Amino acid sequence: RIPESKFFGVQYDPSNAVVAGDDPIELLDAVLGRVVSMHASDRYLVPGATLEDLRQAEGSAGYSKLLLHGVTGRGLNNYPAIFERLSRAGYCGWISIEDGMNGMQEMRESLLYLGQMVDRYYPA
């Protein structure tokens, strides 16, 4: 539980929720009024793996060999739902791209995708 104080906020990272075996949308709904910044990245399951396999792997999700890092918007995170909730809540803080594990081209693709999300949910 987050202490009720203006000095405690949340750095929302949907991929960390996936890594922990949690639902990123449920987490966001629980902390939405406290989000002060967000990391944007995405995780993928290796071919043939399921979320249940991830939850059972090595006793916990963690940084399992069943997860890969890749282009934001193409993995397990539901970014339209995330941006819809953030926009509806009036969030206007930082969105930091946490990417580049597989080279600059993937970083560019992530940036393009996130720009589209911002344009869609935060029209000028």
Positions of the model-derived regions?
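Histidine-acidic metal/acid-base catalytic patches
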Residues: 1-124
